[in-house]
Amino acid sequence: MLVMNSRIIGTPILSVQAGGPIATIKSAIIDPNDLKILGFHLEGPLVNRAEARILDVRSIREYSQLGMVIDNIEELVAPDDVIKIQNVLELNFDLINLKVRTKKGTKLGHIIDYTLTSEDFIVQQIIVRRPLVKSLVDPELTISRKEIVEITDYEVIIKDEEKVLKARAEKEDFVPNFVNPFREQGFAPAKTDDKKD
């Protein structure tokens, strides 16, 4: 299921052992190499003073409308407990507010949100707010991860806009691959006697 990052922020973390919420999600920890979420920074009275304030996504048993379910508070980790998470934290990387441009250098705007899959926590799309002039026609762009060519500390570079728009237009011009039995040869619409006086 695709979920907006903005909807995940503030999601309760539910502990089976405690029988209720122990924290809420503050922000995501994203690996810029593959746009996979490794964990979440948490906040709340039970975790604010503890060193272990990070939820590794591998500890999540279930994600539902109620929140993210884990076994117990012991599942939370400190920043230096998991080497991969520690390495990403040192990069201080965040997708939100990164500028987006094409390979040719056309500025498209900056990232205001993104979608991810709730099964594997991989970013699937970025939502880009357009510059003021372009926003009059199209205020936001939704760009698939397949269009991303490179990610730096300051910007996301995507395939040239013409290719992205062409691919989107082809997708919208999709014709279903089925035969309409009422359009077969030899079929004639029924005649009606609707004579107008």
Over which residues does each language-model region extend?
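Peripheral interaction segments used for macromolecular assembly
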Residues: 1-197
